[in-house]
Amino acid sequence: MADAATEAAGLRNFTINFGPQHPAAHGVLRLVLELDGEVVERVDPHIGLLHRGTEKLIEQKTYLQAIPYFDRLDYVAPMNQEHAFCLAAEKLLGIEAPRRAQLIRVLYCEIGRILSHLLNVTTQAMDVGALTPPLWGFEEREKLMMFYERASGSRMHAAYFRIGGVHQDLPPKLIDDIDNWCDNFIQTVDDLETLLTDNRIFKQRNVDIGVVTLEQAWEWGFSGVMVRGSGAAWDLRKSQPYECYAEMDFDVPIGKNGDCYDRYCIRVEEMRQSVRIMKQCIAKMREPAGQGRVAVDDNKIFPPRRGEMKRSMESLIHHFKLYTEGFRVPAGEVYVAVEAPKGEFGVYLVSDGTNKPYKCKVRAPGFAHLQAMDFICRGHLLADVSAILGSLDIVFGEVDR
């Protein structure tokens, strides 16, 4: 019989594929895991299964035609990405959206934040075995998607933001319905917390799992909830306010342990803060200062209204030129970042003075978070991989692009 040392030398780690057809793999993620028994020794994320060449496609389209591609990046909260691209193009053009358009944009970006956090919190609970939260969460997401549809005609890929404003104004009834929804939604968040926050099993699966220190968060290029969970109050809406966020009164929740449980708690609290911002937006839209146009009054950038086109030949020509050739953007380069639900979503836009972007580099927050899977998962059990993955909040549309 061989001695123990020879046996130990003959042992080798077990390698398995986690995904891409795995229910906890969130889309098309493929992880190659190296296991020593149940303990994870190495994680190798394989990306690219949802690569569609978005950045190259944007170079072939006019600035207006590029907007729908941003809906298809983080398709859980589409309008937040459109926001970054529109702000970047507006910066190059030297224009600013009217006040009402800014309020509508911020309102819908916060709806997107709640859409994303609801999906994440409830599916994270499902990944560790709780089956009730997703049913409650998806009921609320359905109502929010109806608000998307009533504004833009589409439940997911809205293409509602425009360079210089938004596509059309919101009907008063829709604003009232969003207001009423905000009042009732807080109760849903409380119910979710009753189920999860002090739940013994949920805490056992999340507390002290996937710990990220603040130094590690900065080193790996984390942003959003991943940084706030580690104790830094870094939120672009507060630290580098854009549009009308500077006027909004809200708090930035932070964690102290940097584990999965802290990140869950932050997302729950951020949903409450988003409702606060939405209520403020609605109040400001009802004031006289919040009335008016929802796009810039420049027919070289934003198409004229249908009524004008029926009366004015010049308006018809503007409309035709905008939708066939598009408008020209002055040469230059700009980087604009917004606080998307997943973290800092940035757009680096380079213009060469033509009607199409020369280069549009997308900085997806999930990409930086996914590359850290290896160092976060090492030493944890196989069952913890899905809990950690859930708390990173990764969507593959933006990772693979």
UniProtKB/Swiss-Prot annotation:
Sorted alphabetically, which keywords does the UniProt record give?
Cell inner membrane, Cell membrane, Membrane, NAD, Quinone, Translocase, Transport, Ubiquinone
What SUPFAM superfamilies is this protein classified in? HydB/Nqo4-like
Q: Where in the cell is it found?
A: Cell inner membrane
The record ties this protein, via PROSITE patterns, to: COMPLEX1_49K (PS00535)
Give any Gene Ontology cellular component.
plasma membrane
What molecular function terms (GO) are annotated for this protein? NAD binding; NADH:ubiquinone reductase (non-electrogenic) activity; quinone binding
Q: What class of enzyme is it?
A: translocase
Reaction catalysed by this chain?
A: a quinone + NADH + 5 H(+)(in) = a quinol + NAD(+) + 4 H(+)(out)
Assign the protein's first listed, main location to one coarse class. Answer: membrane
Q: What is the top-level taxon of the source organism?
A: Bacteria
Q: What kind of membrane protein is this, topologically?
A: Peripheral membrane protein
Report whether NAD shows up as a keyword of the record.
yes
EC assignment: the record states 7.1.1.-
- Describe the function of this protein: NDH-1 shuttles electrons from NADH, via FMN and iron-sulfur (Fe-S) centers, to quinones in the respiratory chain. The immediate electron acceptor for the enzyme in this species is believed to be ubiquinone. Couples the redox reaction to proton translocation (for every two electrons transferred, four hydrogen ions are translocated across the cytoplasmic membrane), and thus conserves the redox energy in a proton gradient.
PANTHER family from the UniProt entry: NADH DEHYDROGENASE [UBIQUINONE] IRON-SULFUR PROTEIN 2, MITOCHONDRIAL, NADH-UBIQUINONE OXIDOREDUCTASE 49 KDA SUBUNIT
The record's HAMAP family line, in alphabetical order, gives: NDH1_NuoD
Q: Which family does it belong to?
A: Belongs to the complex I 49 kDa subunit family.
Q: How does it assemble?
A: NDH-1 is composed of 14 different subunits. Subunits NuoB, C, D, E, F, and G constitute the peripheral sector of the complex.
The UniProt entry, under NCBIfam families, shows: NuoD, PRK06075.1
Task: Report the protein name in the record.
Answer: NADH-quinone oxidoreductase subunit D
Q: Which gene encodes it?
A: nuoD
